[in-house]
Amino acid sequence: FMENKIDIIDVTLRDGGFTCDFNWPMLFAQEYYDLMSTLGVKYVELGYWKQTNKSQNRFFNLNMDTVREVTGGKGRNNVSVMIDYHYCSKDLNDYPTNEQNEIKMIRMTCRKDMVKEGYEFAVKLKKHTGLVIAFNLFNTTNYTDNELDSALDIVLKSDFDMIGFADTHGHLNLYEDIFRYEHFLHRIIQSD
């Protein structure tokens, strides 16, 4: 008998940041973070870590000062931040490590033409930071089945804590595509 466990990653502040140019009022972000933490949400994703390509605002260009301002320095170790491999810094020293107690996870998105390089960077990032690393293949509705299988051939060699698919632009119709993705999800589960 295997016990199923579901951990929730709330991405409202990060994903919703696109609606407000990543410029949430700090009081709202603080109250939202506290609510999600009180409800037992395992990870609360605040925004993008030190990226500036799409916005100069603080929830797209997160740093430790902003993270601590949102969390109140409570040290709950439940913050997630996202990086987009295409745009992120490739200097490992630009990332938080497990020596702090706010950020627990880095989720990295990767385009299909960068999976190999993104994988190699994420492996180094995991080793350097000691944090939970989630690897997201995004825009997956633009992949062929062979491309998704090839991407999984690469990333399943890792010890990433999570591997996921992202429907970046809202084209995924699980009603129609569930059986297609079922194959790929089984590959991930069986590799564990």
Each predicted region: which residue ranges?
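Short, well-ordered secondary-structure micro-motifs
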Residues: 20, 92, 145-147, 174-177
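Conserved, mostly hydrophobic/aromatic
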Residues: 16, 36, 106, 163
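Catalytic alpha/beta core domains of metabolic enzymes, predominantly
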Residues: 162-192
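N-terminal small/glycine-rich loop or linker at the start of catalytic domains
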Residues: 2-21, 76, 128-138
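Alpha-helical scaffold segments that flank or form the walls of functional sites
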Residues: 28-42
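Polybasic, low-complexity association/targeting segments
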Residues: 2, 145, 161-164
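Charged helix-capping and loop-helix junction motifs
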Residues: 25-27, 60-65, 147-153, 177-184
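Active-site beta->alpha loop and helix N-cap motifs at the rims of alpha/beta catalytic domains
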Residues: 37, 43, 48-151
